[in-house]
Amino acid sequence: MSILIGYIILLACAFGLAAGLFFGLSLIKLI
């Protein structure tokens, strides 16, 4: 059960990182 929670947290972190990178690139293009 704890392994599943850890996997979900890891997935959320990866998704957050990808979203942050995409937002950063969009912001650079906007400027």
Curated annotation (Swiss-Prot):
Give the organism the record lists: Rhodomonas salina
Q: Which GO terms describe its molecular function?
A: electron transporter, transferring electrons within cytochrome b6/f complex of photosystem II activity
Q: Which InterPro entries match?
A: Cyt_b6/f_cplx_su6
What's this protein's family per the entry?
A: Belongs to the PetL family.
Task: From the Swiss-Prot or TrEMBL record, give the protein name.
Answer: Cytochrome b6-f complex subunit 6
User: What are its GO cellular component terms?
Assistant: chloroplast thylakoid membrane; cytochrome b6f complex
Signal peptide feature range: none
Superkingdom assignment: Eukaryota
Which parts of the chain span the membrane according to its record? 3-23
